[in-house]
Amino acid sequence: MGNLATQPYDKITPAMRTRYLSLSPYNLVRVILGEPGPADTSADNVYTRASDCLAEWIDGGILARDREPGVFPYFQEFTEPDTGERLVRKGFIALGGVEDYSAGIVHRHEQTLSGPKKDRMELLRHTHAHCEQLFMLYPDPAGAVDALLDAASAAAPLAEVEDEYGVIHRVWKIAGDGARNIQALMADKKLLIADGHHRYETALAFRGENPGLEGADRVVMTFVNMHSPGLRILATHRLVNNLAADDFPGGFLRAAQSEFRVQPIESLRRLKQAWTAGGPTAIGAAIGQALYLLEDRQPAGELDVRVLHERVLGKLLGIGAEAVRDEKHLRYMRGLEAAVEQARTGAAQAAFLLKPVSVEQVAATSFAGGVMPQKSTDFYPKLLSGLTIYKL
């Protein structure tokens, strides 16, 4: 299985794709992220080749449909990058209904872009298959579903894979009454999309295109209890470039004084202390060799990432929503020290450093019908693609 599964399609670099292709002729990357060619036509392209590839695997017995309904407990054992803590995130893979947001069952927390949806729609139209799970959160503070998953995990897993990041993925199966018990416990749960907004909205559009196609109203999902101790969100820091050098950083720091208390700090420890204290919005700024702490003068309980986008990037630096969307001045980076190093080496004019948002903040925003700025959440680790495939 380790030679067949991949990271999610939007996390696969060209180098990773090359490595996946070398591992096995049956690696899923051939379906979810094929290589375009200079001679591609409407009759021969990445999407037609993906469809042909999947059909060949099914016809040749490489892939076989599981005839017994069930759900698949899916545990991920990992090391939290920022703390070094060893954790297990527990969830299960199953089919979930594709519901309009207006129904109040499935909730989003991000806006989507048209480009990724167009690409995934073409793949879905050609393959009629969902090859990657959507990552969904559900509320279960009592842990009733987790208890059933724990019981199933006492047996040997059906599959165990260690990925390139050292994450160990294990999958089991629950059938019969056990699966029905989980269905019953999940029947009234609201769902929050953690990862996979573009693919969820692609599935919505595909359902609309194919009202008579059996199974088009469902998609494969991994469900994780939002109260699970293994659920982690990492911060995604903002790297800024292409600002007018004649007024940066001096002009920016002076202007920021009207909105924030701007304090030079000696180390990241002071920033982490401000985050731990749980006071007003505290944003770090690494500019060259200097570090600054920006504390909101008039905190209103807004998310730090929203304050950064609206009042720092937008108001003070003139990087509006369209520029953010087009990434004209902005790059994103995981890892506090790595982001600071970008500023210190001059690879970025500034690195703005954010405290990770909490699951509670994401849920409160989403269930209230709101959305967060792009790349506000980085749920870690990512779900492995290729563990299950849902063929319509």
Predicted regions and their residues:
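Surface-exposed, charge/polar-rich loops and edge strands
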Residues: 1-392
